[in-house]
Amino acid sequence: MRNKVPTGRLGGTLVSRELVKYPDVFLRKVSKDVAFPLDDKTKRLITWMTRAMYQHNGIGVAAVQVGYDVRMFTMDCTRYQGKPQVFINPTIVKNSEETITDFEGCLSAPGKQGEVKRHIRITLNYKDEEGEEHQKTFYNMEARCIQHEMDHLEGKLCIDYEKGEYSRDKHNAQTMVDTDFRTKSDS
Protein backbone atom coordinates (compact mmCIF):
# COMPACT_ATOMS: atom_id res chain seq x y z
CA MET A 1 0.00 0.00 0.00
CA ARG A 2 1.06 3.53 -0.57
CA ASN A 3 0.48 4.49 3.05
CA LYS A 4 1.09 2.58 6.26
CA VAL A 5 -1.91 4.15 7.97
CA PRO A 6 -5.55 3.69 6.95
CA THR A 7 -5.65 6.92 5.02
CA GLY A 8 -5.49 6.80 1.26
CA ARG A 9 -4.11 9.07 -1.44
CA LEU A 10 -6.96 11.45 -0.76
CA GLY A 11 -5.91 11.99 2.84
CA GLY A 12 -9.30 10.96 4.20
CA THR A 13 -9.93 8.18 6.64
CA LEU A 14 -11.51 4.91 5.61
CA VAL A 15 -14.87 6.39 6.63
CA SER A 16 -14.76 8.81 3.69
CA ARG A 17 -15.31 7.05 0.37
CA GLU A 18 -14.01 9.65 -2.05
CA LEU A 19 -12.63 8.37 -5.34
CA VAL A 20 -9.46 9.45 -7.12
CA LYS A 21 -10.65 11.25 -10.26
CA TYR A 22 -9.18 11.66 -13.73
CA PRO A 23 -6.83 13.40 -14.59
CA ASP A 24 -5.07 12.64 -11.25
CA VAL A 25 -1.77 10.94 -12.18
CA PHE A 26 -2.19 8.47 -9.31
CA LEU A 27 -4.63 6.57 -11.56
CA ARG A 28 -1.67 5.90 -13.90
CA LYS A 29 0.30 3.97 -11.27
CA VAL A 30 0.97 0.29 -11.86
CA SER A 31 -0.24 -1.50 -8.73
CA LYS A 32 1.91 -3.74 -6.54
CA ASP A 33 1.07 -7.24 -5.30
CA VAL A 34 -0.74 -7.60 -1.99
CA ALA A 35 1.13 -9.49 0.76
CA PHE A 36 -0.51 -12.35 2.68
CA PRO A 37 -1.79 -12.86 5.26
CA LEU A 38 -3.84 -9.71 4.99
CA ASP A 39 -3.38 -7.25 7.84
CA ASP A 40 -6.31 -5.46 9.47
CA LYS A 41 -5.72 -2.29 7.44
CA THR A 42 -5.99 -4.20 4.16
CA LYS A 43 -9.16 -5.91 5.37
CA ARG A 44 -10.64 -2.50 6.20
CA LEU A 45 -9.57 -1.27 2.76
CA ILE A 46 -11.59 -4.09 1.16
CA THR A 47 -14.66 -3.03 3.15
CA TRP A 48 -14.05 0.59 2.18
CA MET A 49 -13.71 -0.29 -1.51
CA THR A 50 -16.93 -2.30 -1.44
CA ARG A 51 -18.84 0.51 0.27
CA ALA A 52 -17.43 3.04 -2.21
CA MET A 53 -18.56 0.82 -5.10
CA TYR A 54 -22.13 0.73 -3.78
CA GLN A 55 -22.17 4.39 -2.69
CA HIS A 56 -21.19 5.51 -6.20
CA ASN A 57 -23.54 3.00 -7.91
CA GLY A 58 -20.67 1.14 -9.54
CA ILE A 59 -20.15 -2.51 -10.37
CA GLY A 60 -16.42 -2.51 -9.64
CA VAL A 61 -13.74 -0.50 -7.83
CA ALA A 62 -9.98 -1.01 -7.93
CA ALA A 63 -7.80 -0.09 -4.95
CA VAL A 64 -6.05 2.60 -6.99
CA GLN A 65 -9.40 4.39 -7.33
CA VAL A 66 -9.52 4.88 -3.56
CA GLY A 67 -5.87 5.89 -3.28
CA TYR A 68 -3.99 2.61 -2.79
CA ASP A 69 -1.69 1.20 -5.47
CA VAL A 70 -2.21 -2.50 -4.69
CA ARG A 71 -3.45 -5.28 -7.00
CA MET A 72 -6.95 -5.70 -5.71
CA PHE A 73 -10.50 -4.89 -6.78
CA THR A 74 -14.08 -5.53 -5.75
CA MET A 75 -16.90 -6.33 -8.17
CA ASP A 76 -20.62 -6.92 -8.00
CA CYS A 77 -22.29 -7.17 -11.40
CA THR A 78 -25.36 -8.62 -9.69
CA ARG A 79 -25.42 -6.00 -6.96
CA TYR A 80 -29.15 -6.38 -6.41
CA GLN A 81 -28.26 -9.72 -4.84
CA GLY A 82 -25.55 -7.97 -2.79
CA LYS A 83 -22.79 -10.47 -3.48
CA PRO A 84 -19.56 -8.49 -3.82
CA GLN A 85 -16.51 -10.44 -4.92
CA VAL A 86 -12.92 -9.56 -3.97
CA PHE A 87 -10.04 -10.28 -6.34
CA ILE A 88 -6.50 -10.03 -4.98
CA ASN A 89 -3.37 -10.28 -7.15
CA PRO A 90 -5.48 -11.25 -10.20
CA THR A 91 -4.01 -12.43 -13.49
CA ILE A 92 -5.89 -13.14 -16.72
CA VAL A 93 -4.58 -16.49 -17.92
CA LYS A 94 -6.87 -17.09 -20.89
CA ASN A 95 -9.31 -15.13 -23.00
CA SER A 96 -11.69 -15.86 -25.84
CA GLU A 97 -10.92 -14.90 -29.40
CA GLU A 98 -14.43 -13.48 -29.64
CA THR A 99 -14.72 -9.85 -28.59
CA ILE A 100 -17.40 -7.21 -28.36
CA THR A 101 -16.99 -3.44 -28.56
CA ASP A 102 -19.13 -1.21 -26.38
CA PHE A 103 -18.98 2.06 -24.49
CA GLU A 104 -17.69 1.98 -20.92
CA GLY A 105 -17.83 4.56 -18.20
CA CYS A 106 -15.71 4.83 -15.09
CA LEU A 107 -16.35 6.11 -11.59
CA SER A 108 -12.96 7.85 -11.72
CA ALA A 109 -13.82 9.64 -14.99
CA PRO A 110 -17.39 10.86 -14.46
CA GLY A 111 -19.16 12.00 -17.59
CA LYS A 112 -16.57 10.44 -19.88
CA GLN A 113 -16.86 7.20 -21.82
CA GLY A 114 -14.61 5.27 -24.13
CA GLU A 115 -15.45 2.71 -26.79
CA VAL A 116 -13.61 -0.44 -25.71
CA LYS A 117 -13.19 -3.85 -27.32
CA ARG A 118 -13.20 -6.60 -24.68
CA HIS A 119 -13.03 -10.39 -24.72
CA ILE A 120 -16.41 -11.94 -23.97
CA ARG A 121 -14.84 -14.73 -21.89
CA ILE A 122 -11.77 -14.68 -19.65
CA THR A 123 -10.17 -17.07 -17.20
CA LEU A 124 -8.74 -15.44 -14.10
CA ASN A 125 -6.31 -16.61 -11.43
CA TYR A 126 -6.71 -14.70 -8.16
CA LYS A 127 -6.62 -14.98 -4.39
CA ASP A 128 -9.50 -14.35 -2.02
CA GLU A 129 -9.32 -12.58 1.34
CA GLU A 130 -8.06 -15.73 3.06
CA GLY A 131 -5.24 -16.12 0.54
CA GLU A 132 -6.85 -19.12 -1.14
CA GLU A 133 -6.03 -19.37 -4.85
CA HIS A 134 -8.83 -19.62 -7.41
CA GLN A 135 -9.12 -20.06 -11.15
CA LYS A 136 -12.49 -19.15 -12.60
CA THR A 137 -13.94 -18.36 -16.01
CA PHE A 138 -16.14 -15.28 -16.37
CA TYR A 139 -18.46 -14.30 -19.22
CA ASN A 140 -20.07 -11.22 -20.73
CA MET A 141 -20.60 -8.35 -18.24
CA GLU A 142 -18.46 -9.92 -15.51
CA ALA A 143 -15.65 -10.51 -18.02
CA ARG A 144 -15.91 -6.90 -19.21
CA CYS A 145 -15.90 -5.54 -15.66
CA ILE A 146 -12.87 -7.63 -14.69
CA GLN A 147 -10.93 -6.46 -17.75
CA HIS A 148 -11.85 -2.86 -16.90
CA GLU A 149 -10.66 -3.24 -13.29
CA MET A 150 -7.51 -5.08 -14.43
CA ASP A 151 -6.74 -2.06 -16.62
CA HIS A 152 -6.87 0.11 -13.48
CA LEU A 153 -4.22 -2.12 -11.89
CA GLU A 154 -1.98 -1.38 -14.89
CA GLY A 155 -2.61 2.38 -14.83
CA LYS A 156 -5.02 2.39 -17.79
CA LEU A 157 -8.48 3.94 -18.11
CA CYS A 158 -11.31 3.02 -20.46
CA ILE A 159 -11.05 6.46 -22.04
CA ASP A 160 -7.54 5.51 -23.22
CA TYR A 161 -9.15 3.17 -25.76
CA GLU A 162 -10.89 6.02 -27.56
CA LYS A 163 -11.42 5.18 -31.22
CA GLY A 164 -11.82 7.75 -33.94
CA GLU A 165 -13.46 11.10 -33.50
CA TYR A 166 -16.74 9.87 -32.06
CA SER A 167 -17.29 9.18 -28.42
CA ARG A 168 -20.30 9.69 -26.22
CA ASP A 169 -18.38 12.28 -24.24
CA LYS A 170 -17.57 14.30 -27.37
CA HIS A 171 -21.09 13.78 -28.73
CA ASN A 172 -22.70 14.92 -25.46
CA ALA A 173 -20.41 17.95 -25.31
CA GLN A 174 -21.40 18.91 -28.85
CA THR A 175 -25.08 18.37 -28.05
CA MET A 176 -24.76 20.64 -25.00
CA VAL A 177 -23.05 23.30 -27.12
CA ASP A 178 -25.77 23.02 -29.78
CA THR A 179 -28.53 23.17 -27.16
CA ASP A 180 -26.90 26.12 -25.41
CA PHE A 181 -26.52 27.92 -28.74
CA ARG A 182 -30.18 27.35 -29.70
CA THR A 183 -31.37 28.52 -26.29
CA LYS A 184 -29.38 31.76 -26.48
CA SER A 185 -30.31 32.52 -30.08
CA ASP A 186 -34.02 31.82 -29.48
CA SER A 187 -34.22 34.41 -26.67
Identify the role of each PLM range.
Residues 2-187:
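Positively charged
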